[in-house]
Amino acid sequence: MIKNGTCPFWERDDLSECARREYIEFKFPLFILLTGMIYAFCKVFRAFYLRRKNHTNEAPEFEEQGNGNHEYARFSVLRLKSAWESRSFCNVNNRSTFDKFKKFIEGAFIVLQLTIHLYILSNMPMDNKKFFHQGFLVQMFLWILLLVVITLRLISASQSFRWVLACKRDLWAVSFYSYASLFTLSILPLRSVFIGKIKDKIMVKYIISETFIDLALLLLLSTSSIEGTRYSFLVENENKKLPPAPTVFGLLTFSRIDRLIWKAYKHCLGNADIWDLDINNKSIAILANFEMSSKKGRLLPNIICYFKAVFISQLFLAFVSSFLNFVPSLLMPRILSYVNDPKSQSWNLVSLYVSSMLVSKIIATTCRGQGLFLGEKGTMQLRTVLISNIYSKTLRRTILKDSTTSLQKNASTSFEENPDSSEAEPRKKSSRKDNSVNNVMSIDAFKVSEAMNTFYLACEAVFMTVTALMILYSLLGWSAFAGTFALLAMIPLNFWCATFYGNYQADQLILTDKRTSGISEALNSIRVIKLLAWENLFYQKIINVRDGEIRLLKKKATIFFLNHLIWFFGPTLVSAITFSVFIKFQNQTLTPTIAFTALSLFAILRTPMDQIASTVSLLIQSFISLERIQDYLNEPETRKYEILEQSNTKFGFEDASMEWEAAETSFKLKNISIDFKLNSLNAIIGPTGSGKSSLLLGLLGELNLLSGKIYVPTVESRDDLEIGKDGMTNSMAYCSQTPWLISGTIKDNVVFGEIFNKQKFDDVMKSCCLDKDIKAMTAGIRTDVGDGGFSLSGGQQQRIALARAIYSSSRYLILDDCLSAVDPETALYIYEECLCGPMMKGRTCIITSHNISLVTKRADWLVILDRGEVKSQGKPSDLIKSNEFLRESINNDSKNTTHNQIDLKRSTTSKKTKNGDPEGENSQDEVCAEVENFEETKMEGSVKFSAYKWLADYFGGLGVVFVFTSSAILIHGITLSQGFWLRYWLETGSSGSKSTWLYRIVEGHSNIYFILTYIVIGFVSSFLTSGKVWIAIISGTNVTKKIFAKLLSSILYAKLRFHNVTPTGRIMNRFSKDMDIIDQQLIPNFEGLSYSVVVCLWIILLIGYVTPQFLLFAIPLCALYYTVCTLYLRASRELKRIDNINISPIHQLFAEAIKGVTTIRALADERRFITQSLVAIDRSNAPFFYLNMATEWITYRVDIIGTLVLFSSSVMIIMKASYLDAGLAGILLSNAFSFTETAQWIIKVFSSVELLMSSVERIKEYTDIPSESNGYISPPANWPQTGDVELKNLSLRYSPHSSKALDNVSFKVKAGTKVGIVGRTGAGKSSIIAAIYRLSDWENGTIIIDNKDIKHIPLERLRNSISCIPQDPTLFDGTVRSNLDPFDRYSDVQIYGVLSKVGLIEECDELSLISEQEQPNFSSHKLRNRFIDLNTVVKSGGSNLSQGQRQLLCLARSMLGARNIMLIDEATASIDYISDAKIQKTIRETMKNTTILTIAHRLRSVIDYDKILVMEMGRVKEYDHPYTLISDRNTIFYRLCRQSGEFENLFELAKVSFDNKR
């Protein structure tokens, strides 16, 4: 009995009458009345007061800061928010008509309640009138208050009471608070009615009616949308679907997602079915709030500051949930006491205990669900913050070297930076590789964000541990502290394991970065790798790194085993120590009630121990990832906003010196003074490596400015510039040497955020010679260019990049060698019609080029560079007279400077894919066919059984899986025997023995015997369970090793067609995210699933065996369990797949930003790209958000079902109390306690397994792709001995639906013959190389080399027998030697010989270099070139070399192997004409007996060859000596020579060659 003053609160088994009258009917309602009235009055008065003051001018939501800071203007999210809102519209999810009708019903119930009060008050007996008047009057006033509140809520729609809208939500809150409180107060009186404690009929009717009305009002309000909340959505698409308006019931039980789950059950979901996010969860709002709350400094304090409200809410919910979770354990001793002696307590009281268990678990489940969902929502928001900050940093990060070394501690230092780098290359100057940067976003950001989920679990674990220990102390006394000390002793072991685990994790991340970098490099260069037959080389390099990862995974598995053993054995050890101390030192009797209550508490303690251990492990990983993110955010940023000076009259340099890096060997531009002519064409020329590209990058502010000044028209953001009357802005547009395109349509790439003007667009297309290409494409300007433009030819990519600059509103254009990728005819057309045409009116253009004769014709200003210095500048006509280099270059270009008229209505050609359809000879139909494949397909339905079987086969088959599952059944049987052993111990009565331990050991059954046996059973069970997990993980690691090797082999040896139509990012997703899932998540989840299923089956069978009546509850509960699980699994599967697909665009945008950051910054378009990233993040967040809501939806329902299992078990136990002993009842309740958690775990793990199995499906899909057909007849070792090549009736198409790239091609090349292959872009030239290398399967025909049909020769043997110099110079991360001779087949003398021949080192230095290899002393030997020694670092893609230098190094690589056949694909396009002439001379002199097939746009390069093969539309049109063809006016070759602008020179060279060979 609990007393308060003179009024007892509880009498025997019910609430006392005076307590009901004083507290339930008076004091508590009075408190509700006063708090509700004060709160409502304050809110209404405030709203009325503000309305009267008519505060219509609201303060701006965000204050502008740093208005003079151009960098702030470009990157501040606060500045973006207003622009975002102006482009979108606000859609408000209004209340339904039915919700409005419910308010009238609510008012009617309140009136009814007042009527009932008046009726009872008027009919109350006089002797009770004074007391009852007090309580009734309070309740009447409370209902009058609620009537006023509902009235105000109803009249808020009236124009006369619009001020009420401001406090409508507060009024709604008062109503809900009152209804919920009143219903809660009515529960105990209603119980008194049911058990017959209240006899008065009027009071019985009153209590029943009051409870019913309170419940009805509560249900009405809980199921109606929350008033006063403008649940609005900032959307870009009017058709975007909105979720149902939130209700209290929907928020608490997650029923708000019911419609989406039901829709997913009926059919597969698509992106269009996913509801939009509300404004508060939009990325722009999240980032704006984060930016306002953040201070300069480290990321972690800012994250804590921003999410402090979430943390506090989770802390409170964890406290409530943790306490309520122990209510069943507190009530368990009373239930077991009743089972032990049914007469000790009344049935009413025991039924109250059982009901209290049900209610407490439901409330605890609700609090836990809300706490976890807050964490999951925080995960989404933190992920948004991290990804956005990383993306924004990428747009600010410097392109220069040594911006960081945090991810690559062992990275080598480059010998010199690229003086003539292209767009893709400058961005790679950082020593952090782009793929490592991508890991920061794709892996580290996700790991850190997942830590938000752990905060609630960590708080819950702490509270549960403390509460459990307090209850244990009250139950066992000070012996509970013995167990506590044992528990604390395990914490250092946990931290020791966590420390080792974290160290291994950090080492693994380094290897993962290295592996993904290697894979990305291989994928980006797959065509060259196949041409060089280096698949095995790259396969072995990647596998070696992977082996290191596998070793670390196994070490982590061992640490996990130790940690797992501690987790499982901990409760056994703690309970054994506690019981021993309790019996021996406290001399207490251990009863079943005490023992099984303590065991239930120890079982509950296992959960927080698990959570603490897993939380520590996850937090360590998260902190490691956070440090990596912090390191990235701390990297140096571009200084362009500081070093560029704005000027309206000057554009250029004033005594400026610039460099790539602060190193002696770094390339420098020295004392540059150039004043470019405004509204004119300015040309920059110079030999290869002179610094032309670096000069342009310096003008853009991308290099380090050592001294001097750089003047540009503006440094403001593109959005802030005013458009002039001519439609132009004072901004710059940049077109890089290597074209940079975004994934999207041709229109997207050209318009690039500008306003679309059809006439202007058509004019730009025509001037850039793209109009014919567009017409040839089925989709026209809507043709998707693919990943990096891989569906287009190199020429088309360059022209689209140029068109983007021309179409822009920029008045200043900076073009880096944009004419080298097109044939001479197209180059001349673009120069005349575009660069010197009407599109350039009022514009200033700066262009670099090797085509000196072309660009100098109409240039107004010419700058000549050499070795980073301006040698001369001025008008071209003046410089030609005085500059020897210029005069020599023009003479080499053309002795006839008068070009012939060309047909401006020329036809352009079709496309070329990035890696495989080299010149794009496949038709535009193929483009459209490929475009259909650009979007990643979403798997539908459940994961196929074939995927499970495929994975099981790697484990050894389904038999191994069966054995593994059977072992789980046996092991848990051992675990259950612990409880039965304890029951047996207690039944023996030995616990009360007073004999000495030594004597009883001799005699037999002593306490120590039982305790030691109990410990042994627990240890064996824990060891076997942990060992099973360890075996599973180790086996899984071996399986993932095999799967990775299979996947890598499948990708590397796949047909080139696969790489053409599959974006690199999609393939990388398999190697990174999907492989990481199989490595670290899938197998542990499989093991956890099997264990949880076994546990649940054991529990159900145990309870059903002891109390068969339980099966009556079990059947409907299982049916309900199955139903909700089925609904959830289908919905979660669809949402997860959409989430996986929607993440890819974020990776794509990030990869594009890395490659194109120079172009983006030049256009001052950072703000638009940040906005695009936010849109992509929102599209990814939507399915992620609703997936988490669906997860909590199922968790809540499974918890409720588990609570019902506990409740039904308890009911069965008290009903069969006379037939059960307390020990058996304790075993049943202990297991029933764990059923909820285990059942919930099954759903989570099973859904996780199915979701994770989608990664297996995706990987399996890529292991089944067709590989290249291999030959089976090995030719002789010296094949090809002579070099005869013959094509017979060869036809080739790149896809079944495309036109023929080669159509019945036949020609023969004799050994030692040099053949030039010419023709317009897309004529089929590069398809010949593709056919000879068998990069694509032929439709028909044969290719004979030295009397061998190459179709039957093994691919590696074939490709190793032919040398090739591809059009795109591809180098790999390593050294000069590893790029030239990765297999160490050649000596230094041979390597220096080819370097000398291609002009990378001077001939006089060759012997010096060889002698210095033994004792290098480069300080005393000054080189003119950048190659210090053969171990000089070459970065991935050759990014630290100029385009020309890369091409020369590739030429040296092909010349190193003495092969009898060489294929050259436009290998000198990026080299100046003088160097080109020298290289061609070298080729002719050193390869006299080699058969050479050269594709060339520069006709001068092949005019003295033995034969010219003219291709057109995939057919051979002409094949003869150059002189023969050029002498015939009717030949295509004659027309090509005429259109080149140097006909007379070509004719003379051809004639000399012809005469020399007669």
Curated annotation (Swiss-Prot):
Q: Which PROSITE patterns has this protein been placed in?
A: ABC_TM1F, ABC_TRANSPORTER_1, ABC_TRANSPORTER_2
Comp. bias (Basic and acidic residues): 424-434
Q: Which InterPro entries match?
A: AAA+_ATPase, ABC1_TM_dom, ABC1_TM_sf, ABC_transporter-like_ATP-bd, ABC_transporter-like_CS, ABC_transporter_C-like, P-loop_NTPase
Residues holding ATP: 686-693, 1319-1326
Segments forming domain ABC transporter: 651-892, 1285-1538
How is the protein disposed in the membrane? Multi-pass membrane protein
**Keywords on this record?**
ATP-binding, Glycoprotein, Membrane, Nucleotide-binding, Repeat, Transmembrane, Transmembrane helix, Transport
Principal subcellular localization: membrane
Any Pfam family hit? ABC_membrane
UniProt entry tagged with the keyword Repeat: yes
Cytoplasmic-side positions? 51-103, 152-169, 223-302, 375-449, 505-558, 606-953, 1035-1082, 1133-1199, 1244-1558
Which segments constitute the ABC transmembrane type-1 domain?
A: 311-621, 961-1251
Superkingdom: Eukaryota
Compositionally biased intervals (Polar residues)? 892-901
**A GO term from the CC aspect:** fungal-type vacuole membrane
Q: Where are the transmembrane segments?
A: 30-50, 104-124, 131-151, 170-190, 202-222, 303-323, 352-374, 450-470, 482-504, 559-579, 585-605, 954-974, 1014-1034, 1083-1105, 1110-1132, 1200-1220, 1223-1243
* Subcellular localization(s) per the UniProt record: Membrane
- What GO molecular functions are on record for this protein? ABC-type transporter activity; ATP binding; ATP hydrolysis activity
Q: Which family does it belong to?
A: Belongs to the ABC transporter superfamily. ABCC family. Conjugate transporter (TC 3.A.1.208) subfamily.
Descriptive protein name: ABC transporter NFT1
**Organism expressing this protein natively:** Saccharomyces cerevisiae (strain YJM789) (Baker's yeast)
